[in-house]
Amino acid sequence: MSGPVPTTRQPAAPPRAIALMPAVLQHEWDLYHATWFTLMGVGGGIFLLARLLRLERGLGVWLGLPVVDLVSFAVISAGGLLLIWSLGRPLRFLRAVLKPGTSWISRGAIADFIFVALGGALILPGLALGGATSFARLPWDPWASTTLGRVIEGVALAAAAIVIVYAGLVLADKAAVTFWRSWAIPAQFVFSSLAMSMATVMLMQTLDGTPIESLECWLLAKFLALLLAVIAWHVVTRRTQPGKAEALARLHTVYGGLFWGVVITAGTVLPMLLAVLAALVPPTRDALGVAALLLTVAGGFLLRLLTLRVGYFPPVSGVLRVPKR
């Protein structure tokens, strides 16, 4: 006599994750921050490039001081004031500055202060007011021709480099927004800043009657080529990652015309081609330098603004479990 046929219990299907909250578009970072990022990049970049290429003497002197350095300090100061404005309250700014161990805003703000202070000290011996050079006895000069001057210049250059890169690191470092959490964001901002700065230096050469050399043109073209490569890498990799997928969809649909028309074509590819043409045809350099500045600044600013405006917090999903009785 046979007993009942035992039944085999099928293993329970693993619980499936369900969506708890969709991707949410961020609204805190916008126009002020894009302007701040742009000013910091250009302000630090023109000092860095002019000094490394030893062009500061050929970009004009006013009251015994290098004009390019004065422009750099003014742009950085404007960016710093905008940072304070964007944070809303002075005390909030102070709290942000006092966290260098965890905050790139704090590190960048400190670098801003060091840059302006040491850069200002570097050029101070050249100050001439009414024919008097009250600080000429200092053991260095604005052109860093002494050992102490070169040390001051070196620290100022290091601070300028941090000023250029920290805006991108603010976004990329531990960001909850997926589109920003990539090395490509600070890399884009750096190459864009260097391109805008190189074009600015070329314009200042034109205004001062200093010939633009082929080196400046080739550097501008290389910065833009590297920028284009990094942007391309960023938009074609990890396209399905939660948060980034929504960002790319918004970038291509809502801002597709600005992104492809202004950032990529007019702001990157066109000035890159103009820079190559200027390198090969010297008589065109002055005019093409002006055009390159207008195009790179428009493209660079919009690159930063669109990067902010397509930032999504990723969707949240989870598994609901019913406790066993």
Each model region followed by its residue ranges:
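Long, contiguous internal "core" modules enriched in hydrophobic/ aromatic residues
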Residues: 28-31, 35-42, 54-59, 102-105, ...
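Membrane helical hairpin/interfacial module
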Residues: 46-118
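Membrane-interfacial segments
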Residues: 56, 88-92, 175, 207-208, ...
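C-terminal ends of transmembrane helices
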Residues: 82-95, 167-179, 235, 307
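Membrane-helix cytosolic exit motif
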Residues: 298-315
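Short, highly charged, low-complexity non-transmembrane loops/tails of multi-pass membrane proteins
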Residues: 311-325
